[in-house]
């Protein structure tokens, strides 16, 4: 078994500083001015490193980053990369994680998460905080727990997503999504879930003006719906009005508000 070459407290500049690096352990190193320092790298471990310029990890594979920092100009940092784990790190740069597969994020903050996690496949997130619009657009096969998100248009077009114990302050969340299940979470934002297919909310608190319209197959169980104007309505509702502690669901049949089946579980606050 080959021992990994180690770098300690380096200050690396210039384009492609460690291009096609393989079997490396890199400690407390600053990747300063210079694009694509680890492009096409393989089997890399990063500990306490800092990325200060663009495109650090493109077309890379088998990457582990712990206690690392992507500064604002480290934008578009991880694209077209497979099998990457980032833990206990801060990513200030926008447009990170694009068309990646097998992504694991644990205890990561994204203070500028605009256009982050686009078109990714196989994403696991635990204890992530993100602020920015269009988070996780068109990504699929995601398992997310304890995500706190401040940003609109999240999960647009996402497929096969499971969220647990999350807090989403997001207008237009889950638009055009498919096969999304949310457990024990708080969601606040207008127009939740429009044009989605197979959206399930279980044990959630939802505050959404005109939310959940034009949905095909909506399931809600043990949910609280707060401060709601006209929202999800469909043929499956059994009465014209179902009163809740926190609002009214208006069931107006044959108006095309929601498509096909909506299921309102008897235990829900609806």
What is each model feature region?
Residues 1-270:
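Long, distal/terminal scaffolding or interaction modules
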